[in-house]
C-alpha cells in the first residue's frame, strides 16, 4: 500500500509507521526488507520527514538530511 506524502512522493505506510518508533523502528523495518545496513528516519524540516530510508546507518548525516 502506497500513499502520497505532502511532498507528492509515494511512501510506504509501513515505513512511516516504523519511523514513528524512531531509529530502532527503522532499523527493524529495513532488516525485514532484507537490508542489513540499519535504517534512518527522515528528520524535521526535510522533504522526507516521517519515513524510513534503508541505505545507511541510523546516525548517518546524509540519511537524516535526505541527501541520498
From Swiss-Prot:
> What residue ranges carry the coiled-coil annotation?
none
Any idea where this protein resides?
Secreted; Target cell membrane
**Which Gene Ontology terms cover its molecular function?**
lipid binding
Function, please?
A: Shows antibacterial activity against numerous Gram-positive bacteria. It selectively inhibits peptidoglycan biosynthesis through complex formation with the cell wall precursor lipid II (1:1 molar ratio) thus inhibiting cell wall synthesis.
Q: Which modifications occur after translation, per UniProt?
A: Contains 5 disulfide bonds.
Please tell me where this protein is predominantly located. Answer: secreted
Q: What is this protein called?
A: Defensin gallicin
Signal peptide as annotated in the record: 1-16
Tissues where the protein occurs: Expressed in hemolymph, gills, digestive gland, foot, adductor muscles and mantle.
- What parts of the sequence cross the membrane? none
Give the highest taxon in the source lineage. Eukaryota
Species name for this entry?
Answer: Mytilus galloprovincialis
Provide one Gene Ontology cellular component. Answer: other organism cell membrane
Question: Which terms does the UniProt entry file under GO BP?
Answer: defense response to bacterium; innate immune response
The UniProt keywords, alphabetically, are: Antibiotic, Antimicrobial, Defensin, Disulfide bond, Immunity, Innate immunity, Lipid-binding, Membrane, Secreted, Signal, Target cell membrane, Target membrane
